[in-house]
């Protein structure tokens, strides 16, 4: 569906060149939700603008839905963009138009008849859950409702690809989850390919099938979301994964505990799939002469299965504690002894 081959984008100015995107090669499959994550300045937004031709690459090729976006211009590019829609962080609605008229706007531009516009708008309003808000203006809507209008408008011309540029960054956590749920539902119902730009690993974990991590214009890591969570390779990726698995509260708890404890071992357990649901701690207590203290834990769902982490403290004779670590590993659970945070 989307292929990028050795794509680079350099912005030139009198103050010097900025290498926004550097030699990126990516393949995004039809019907998947693909996440691109990175901090500010990583090159995410520049990359997404290359996908719909808002920017042209300095080198390399960009192909979307069978068209080489990097090589077409004018009427052909405008036609290609009808198959590549986009939603934004700040909604970009027309404030003088109602919900109905905002959604109808791209259909008007495309020359669709009024009767067909009204029919399509009614379908989209139902799809995004805005029944009863047809005649409301953007100023009368919540942030989540505004983004739903943006999504409906983006879907008006039946695109093959939906680009989401920090689409949930301006929303509160509960509203973020509702919008992510809507995008996931649309992906399943319509088979729509979604490319999602974010700086929040929670967003990636929640709905993406695969993810690419960007730093300084480069893709430093790429893979299935569950695999990236289990075994992140790059330091940048590890920091993002820790947003979900080791939030600030967890680090504070561990730091305090390690400072106060002089015996035993503090162990981080990492569970994947069915192992996340096994009664491992009960088995340890029954099998070994040790004391087990559960410090903190969390199980999260990804599109490919469950992933969990649990921090425990095991105290007892050294040989018994060592046997516990070996036992944990024999149950297809990773065990890492924590000495500092």
Curated annotation (Swiss-Prot):
Name the UniProt record assigns to this protein: Methionine import ATP-binding protein MetN 2
Q: What is the top-level taxon of the source organism? A: Bacteria
Report the GO molecular function annotations.
ABC-type D-methionine transporter activity; ATP binding; ATP hydrolysis activity
Q: What does this protein do?
A: Part of the ABC transporter complex MetNIQ involved in methionine import. Responsible for energy coupling to the transport system.
Q: Where in the cell is it found?
A: Cell membrane
Q: At which positions is ATP bound? A: 38-45
Q: Which reaction does it catalyse?
A: L-methionine(out) + ATP + H2O = L-methionine(in) + ADP + phosphate + H(+); D-methionine(out) + ATP + H2O = D-methionine(in) + ADP + phosphate + H(+)
Which Pfam families does the record match to this protein?
ABC_tran, NIL
- Please state which protein family the record places this protein in: Belongs to the ABC transporter superfamily. Methionine importer (TC 3.A.1.24) family.
The way this protein sits in the membrane is described as: Peripheral membrane protein
Q: What's its EC?
A: 7.4.2.11
Query: What quaternary structure, including any partners, is listed in this protein's UniProt entry?
Result: The complex is composed of two ATP-binding proteins (MetN), two transmembrane proteins (MetI) and a solute-binding protein (MetQ).
Keywords, A to Z, come to: Amino-acid transport, ATP-binding, Cell membrane, Membrane, Nucleotide-binding, Translocase, Transport
Pull one GO CC term from this UniProt entry: plasma membrane
UniProt domain ABC transporter: residue ranges: 2-241
> InterPro entries from the xrefs?
AAA+_ATPase, ABC_transporter-like_ATP-bd, ABC_transporter-like_CS, ACT-like_dom_sf, MetN_ABC, MetN_ABC_transporter-like, NIL_domain, P-loop_NTPase
């Amino acid at each position: 569906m989307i292929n990028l081959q050795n794509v680079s984008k350099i912005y030139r100015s009198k103050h010097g060149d900025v290498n926004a995107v550097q030699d990126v090669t990516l393949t995004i499959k039809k019907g998947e939700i693909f996440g691109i994550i990175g901090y500010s300045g990583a090159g995410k937004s520049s990359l997404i603008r290359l996908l719909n031709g808002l920017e042209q690459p300095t080198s390399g090729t960009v192909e979307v839905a069978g068209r080489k976006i990097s090589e077409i211009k004018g009427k052909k590019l405008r036609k290609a963009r009808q198959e590549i829609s986009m939603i934004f962080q700040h909604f970009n609605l027309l404030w003088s138009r109602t919900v109905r008229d905002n959604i109808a706007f791209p259909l008007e531009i495309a020359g669709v008849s009024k009767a067909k516009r009204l029919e399509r708008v009614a379908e989209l309003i139902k799809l995004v859950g805005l029944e009863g808000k047809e005649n409301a203006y953007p100023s009368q809507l919540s942030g989540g409702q505004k983004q739903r209008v943006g999504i409906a408008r983006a879907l008006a011309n039946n695109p093959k690809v939906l680009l989401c540029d920090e689409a949930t960054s301006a929303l509160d956590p509960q509203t973020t989850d509702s919008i992510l749920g809507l995008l996931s539902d649309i992906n399943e119902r319509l088979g729509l390919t979604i490319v999602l730009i974010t700086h929040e690993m929670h967003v990636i974990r929640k709905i993406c099938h695969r993810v690419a991590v960007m730093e300084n214009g480069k893709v430093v890591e790429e893979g299935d979301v569950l695999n990236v969570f289990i075994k992140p390779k790059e330091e940048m990726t590890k920091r993002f994964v820790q947003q979900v698995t080791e939030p600030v509260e967890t680090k504070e708890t561990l730091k305090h505990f390690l400072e106060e404890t002089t015996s035993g071992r503090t162990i981080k357990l990492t569970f994947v799939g069915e192992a996340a649901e096994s009664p491992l701690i009960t088995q340890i207590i029954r099998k070994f002469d040790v004391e087990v203290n559960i410090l903190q834990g969390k199980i999260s769902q990804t599109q490919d299965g469950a992933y969990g982490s649990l921090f425990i403290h095991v105290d007892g004779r050294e040989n018994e504690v060592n046997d516990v670590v070996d036992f944990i590993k024999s149950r297809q659970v990773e065990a890492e002894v924590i000495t500092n945070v």
